[in-house]
């Protein structure tokens, strides 16, 4: 809908492979394979590469650079208060040993959003704290340096049931990394055996 609405000048769709490594560091081959699967899923949902720019996060080195600078604008205490980070840490049983890359992924997401001057970011309800944290980073950056970054707005699905899809295990959210999802490429038999 977004790519065809005419409301937005450009649409950027990211395949977040670098972020996927934050909780799959032991399995880089899985992340590599998921790049292809996610791209195919995007296109099977109707994303048109002629209308939307689909890119791979790790191929844009400037995103890492921007993340590095943004890290100085966010405190550890602020990251610890982020409700999305808290719930993700619990879901992945990282309480005792949180990988730094995983802990700081909200800062990386802020880079992913602001690098492209995104005005609108489609998210589920669980991602609202991430957008809020991005807005805080933008505000602080613009105040300290120069008013050059855009404060993005969240775009939630109109259907409230789509704002947070539960996993097939009934817990948390549906997620590839949690292994509790149905893939668009799943056969009918695969879907039945997952129930």
Map each language-model feature to its residues.
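N-terminal Rossmann-like or analogous alpha/beta NTP/dinucleotide-binding catalytic cores
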Residues: 1-110
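Active-site cores that bind ATP or allylic diphosphates and position pyrophosphate for catalysis
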Residues: 86-195
């Amino acid at each position: 809908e977004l790519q065809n609405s005419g409301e937005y000048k450009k649409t950027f769709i990211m395949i977040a492979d670098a972020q996927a490594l934050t909780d799959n560091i032991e399995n880089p081959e899985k992340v590599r394979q998921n790049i292809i699967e996610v791209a195919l899923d995007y296109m099977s949902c109707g994303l048109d590469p002629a209308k939307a720019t689909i890119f791979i996060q790790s191929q844009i080195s400037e995103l890492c650079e921007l993340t590095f600078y943004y890290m100085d604008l966010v405190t550890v205490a602020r990251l610890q208060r982020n409700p999305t980070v808290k719930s993700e840490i619990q879901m992945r049983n990282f309480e005792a040993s949180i990988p730094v890359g995983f802990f700081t992924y909200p800062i990386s997401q802020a880079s992913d959003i602001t690098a492209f001057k995104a005005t609108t970011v489609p998210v589920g309800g669980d991602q609202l704290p991430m957008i809020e944290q991005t807005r805080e980073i933008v505000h602080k950056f613009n105040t300290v340096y120069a008013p050059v970054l855009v404060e993005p707005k969240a775009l939630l699905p109109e259907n409230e049931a789509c704002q947070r899809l539960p996993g097939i295990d009934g817990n948390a959210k549906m997620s590839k990394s949690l292994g509790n999802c149905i893939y668009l490429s799943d056969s009918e038999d695969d879907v039945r055996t997952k129930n």
